[in-house]
């Protein structure tokens, strides 16, 4: 019986990237790197620093199993159990959304607005993250603003379990208060407390009518609860109503947006907010909206 070929890291990456590309897998290089890094316990950069490292038969079988899952459509981040956001590594599974690069831009915009208001230089700015999911926004804010006190709210107890795990991993658990609360509930403001210097939210904003148009792997694997609202605007409306009582005067409200949502969300804000700004993503689509409480 012929011996199994001994694969090096670089050979296996090259072959897998080409195979994934042939099979029309999104981001074939990223998929191959994340899966192989997961199997070997290496960061993506380390794969290339240790490119001649041979794989054991056990490692090769584990990598093949991971590739089979990817070919079936399961997102690579769920297979590897990790995703990167703003340069930080987060644990993810099907209980939470996979962090997106567009959300990094919204977070950066929120921090810029907070800095412009002067509130980021306070001894301990108070921040509320509504719909925290994996905790990537709340935890990144805690890491970037070491004096910040953060409240992270989500309606999903399962999502909060993931967020707590990530907060523990990044050493910020003592500065983040996790709250199970529904932003659509009249009791939401009482549940989360306040007042806050920054309220940031990436709420469910996909209208029910658009659900069938999303990528199949999103519909099959990512939590619908975190993505969809009947018209796409219910959470914006509820948060906009609650925000004046949650934010200090001059406090910043920052939303991630549906690409077509800026005008409607602006209308929902009413007269309680000033200096409304809309920011665009890498594709020049409206992606974030921020304003200040009056």
Swiss-Prot record:
Domain of life of the native organism: Bacteria
An individual GO BP term: methylation
Pfam families: MTS, PrmC_N
Catalytic activity: L-glutaminyl-[peptide chain release factor] + S-adenosyl-L-methionine = N(5)-methyl-L-glutaminyl-[peptide chain release factor] + S-adenosyl-L-homocysteine + H(+)
GO function terms (MF aspect): nucleic acid binding; protein-(glutamine-N5) methyltransferase activity; protein-glutamine N-methyltransferase activity
Keywords, alphabetical: Methyltransferase, S-adenosyl-L-methionine, Transferase
InterPro entries: DNA_methylase_N6_adenine_CS, HemK-like, N5-glutamine_MTase, PrmC_N, RF_methyltr_PrmC, SAM-dependent_MTases_sf, Small_mtfrase_dom
Known function: Methylates the class 1 translation termination release factors RF1/PrfA and RF2/PrfB on the glutamine residue of the universally conserved GGQ motif.
PANTHER family, A to Z: HEMK METHYLTRANSFERASE, MTRF1L RELEASE FACTOR GLUTAMINE METHYLTRANSFERASE
Family in the record: Belongs to the protein N5-glutamine methyltransferase family. PrmC subfamily.
Name assigned to this protein: Release factor glutamine methyltransferase
Taxonomic path: Bacteria, Pseudomonadati, Chlorobiota, Chlorobiia, Chlorobiales
């Amino acid at each position: 019986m012929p011996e199994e070929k001994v694969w090096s890291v670089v050979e296996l990456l090259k072959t897998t990237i080409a195979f994934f590309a042939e099979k029309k897998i999104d981001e074939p290089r990223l998929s191959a790197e994340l899966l192989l890094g997961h199997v070997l316990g290496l960061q993506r950069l380390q794969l290339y620093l240790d490119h001649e490292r041979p794989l054991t038969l056990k490692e090769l079988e584990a990598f093949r199993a991971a590739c089979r899952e990817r070919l079936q459509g399961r997102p690579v981040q769920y297979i590897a159990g990790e995703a990167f956001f703003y340069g930080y590594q987060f644990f993810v599974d099907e209980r939470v959304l996979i962090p997106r690069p567009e959300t990094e831009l919204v977070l950066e915009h929120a921090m810029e607005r907070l800095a412009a208001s002067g509130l980021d230089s306070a001894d301990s700015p108070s921040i509320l993250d509504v719909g925290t999911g994996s905790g990537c926004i709340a935890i990144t804010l805690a890491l970037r603003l070491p004096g910040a006190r953060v409240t992270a709210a989500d309606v999903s107890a399962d999502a909060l379990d993931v967020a707590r795990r990530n907060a523990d991993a990044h050493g910020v658990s003592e500065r983040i208060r996790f709250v199970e609360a529904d932003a659509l509930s009249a009791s939401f403001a009482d549940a989360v407390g306040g007042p806050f210097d920054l309220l940031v939210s990436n709420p469910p904003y996909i209208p029910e009518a658009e659900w069938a148009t999303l990528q199949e792997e999103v519909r099959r694997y990512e939590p619908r609860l975190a993505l969809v609202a009947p018209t796409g605007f219910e959470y914006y409306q509820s948060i906009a109503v609650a925000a004046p009582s949650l934010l200090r005067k001059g406090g910043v409200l920052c939303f991630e947006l549906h690409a077509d949502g800026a005008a409607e969300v602006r209308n929902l804000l009413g007269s309680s907010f000033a200096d409304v700004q809309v920011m665009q993503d890498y594709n020049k689509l409206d992606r974030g909206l921020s304003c200040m409480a009056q």
